[in-house]
Amino acid sequence: MTKDKWLGHGAILATNLIFGLNTPIAKTIVPEWISPYALTFVRMVFATLVFWGIGLLAPKEEVGKRDLWTIFWGALFGLVGAQVSFANALLYTSPVNITIIAAMTPLAVMLIAALILKEPVTFKKAAGVLIGASGALLIIFQSSAINTDSSGNWIGNLLCIVNVITYAIYLVITRPISQRYSAITLMKWMFLFSALISFPPGISDLPEAKVFGTESNPFVILKLSYI
């Protein structure tokens, strides 16, 4: 294996590790320290500041009005919709369920791409979709049978599925413009729209967030910073 392939595999492993830790860490602060809506708003605002700051140093790119609308819908589905459903799922289900159901994202992308972009679905792809969907349904039914609060667990798992679907829609509808603009340009506009969309529910919950109050501590702040 070449050096570049080793670096590529290492980057993928590091990315999966970072995202894998994100869910259990978020579970420890939601909702005790911050509500799902406030968490989403804080994440969007922080990312907006970061990407617009980086954008000041990057080459300028003009974004067309039609593409701005595509970015807006991408922000609505992929960032606000996916993140709100993810944060609310933390209230009801386990990090393990969230992570396993999230593995269905490639399958959801394939189905939505077939509907929106008319991409062909082969027999192998269809078989993969059925296997993946069966696994997610098995998790939902098993967790409902094991847990005493089955209704809450059902809600959490369904929110996970909403997270998968909204994020898949985001990936599909933003695919064409991702080839025309740099990642920095797309992210700075997408997070800006996301911050504006998440502002009303997020700002109303923010004053009650204990993570920013006197009860907070550096360890909790560190967890929030990681997320």
Feature roles, as predicted:
Residues 1-42, 149-176, 197-200:
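Glycine-/small-residue-enriched transmembrane alpha-helix faces in small-molecule transporters
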Residues 18, 22-23, 52-102, 138, ...:
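Specific transmembrane alpha-helical segments of multi-pass solute transporters/efflux pumps
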Residues 18-33, 46, 84-93, 101, ...:
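Juxtamembrane C-cap of transmembrane helices in multi-pass membrane transport proteins
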Residues 20-21, 45-49, 133, 192-196:
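Small-residue-rich packing faces within the transmembrane alpha-helices of Major Facilitator Superfamily
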Residues 24-33, 91, 140-153, 203-223:
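Membrane-interface helix termini and inter-helical loops of multi-pass transporters
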Residues 38-49, 77, 86-126, 163:
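Specific alpha-helical transmembrane segments that line the substrate/conduction pathway
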Residues 51, 109-110, 115, 148-209:
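Transmembrane alpha-helical segments that form core, pore/gating elements
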Residues 51, 121-143, 198:
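Hydrophobic transmembrane alpha-helices of multi-pass small-molecule transport proteins
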